[in-house]
Amino acid sequence: MTSDRMRRVNEAMREVLSGAITQELKDPRVGFVTVTAVETSPDLRHARVYVSVLGNPGERKRSMQALNKAHGFLQRRVAGELRIKNTPQLEFLYDDTVENAMRITQLLEEGE
């Protein structure tokens, strides 16, 4: 599969998952979750879904557990929205790039 097509599939999956998590997922353990990126394998059998979660470490852990528990529902949403041969098995991973950027900014400001 071409990299351009992979990029389009990843972006489409990110949009579908973002909408499903924020508007359709009713689990109270899911806090303020943002899907930051999706990386699918070339054969579209696996997808890593990177999410950032606003809150303390306990809230993050509960949100990640709830997302992993709801992976079947979210996978069906992807299958229903996208026309792709295989629906990827979803794996949710915590994305700490926002935290790291804030920490670096704080360190730079302290150094001035």
PLM regions: where:
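Charge-rich, low-complexity N-terminal segments
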Residues: 1-47, 52-112
